[in-house]
């Protein structure tokens, strides 16, 4: 799907301030992303989500993340994620490839 090395660079620049990816990693401003793929929105244990995230009810996978990461607040109105999104599809695909490799 994407380039894992480029995706890691994007994660460090745009995501790591608020998220961790390793198993047992702590929640920061955003939840730890270990086990992200195949999990429903708003389900990371021990993280306090908005009702919007808890009730969205979609399963995270490559397709849902591709859409979400373009404009998080449009995809889940009411989310507390303050990230504006990534407009370039290739950059989102690289990030998703990295997340897939590092969160399971």
From Swiss-Prot:
It is found in: Mitochondrion intermembrane space. One of its GO terms (molecular function) is metal ion binding. GO terms for cellular component: mitochondrial intermembrane space. The modification N-acetylglycine is found at residue 2. Binds 1 heme c group covalently per subunit. InterPro entries: Cyt_c-like_dom (IPR009056), Cyt_c-like_dom_sf (IPR036909), Cyt_c_1A/1B (IPR002327). Its main location: mitochondrion. The keyword Iron applies. Heme c binds at residues 15, 18-19, 81. Keywords: Acetylation, Electron transport, Heme, Iron, Metal-binding, Mitochondrion, Respiratory chain, Transport. Electron carrier protein. The oxidized form of the cytochrome c heme group can accept an electron from the heme group of the cytochrome c1 subunit of cytochrome reductase. Cytochrome c then transfers this electron to the cytochrome oxidase complex, the final protein carrier in the mitochondrial electron-transport chain. Belongs to the cytochrome c family. This is Cytochrome c. It comes from Tetraodon nigroviridis (Spotted green pufferfish). The lineage of its organism: Eukaryota, Metazoa, Chordata, Craniata, Vertebrata. The gene is cyc.
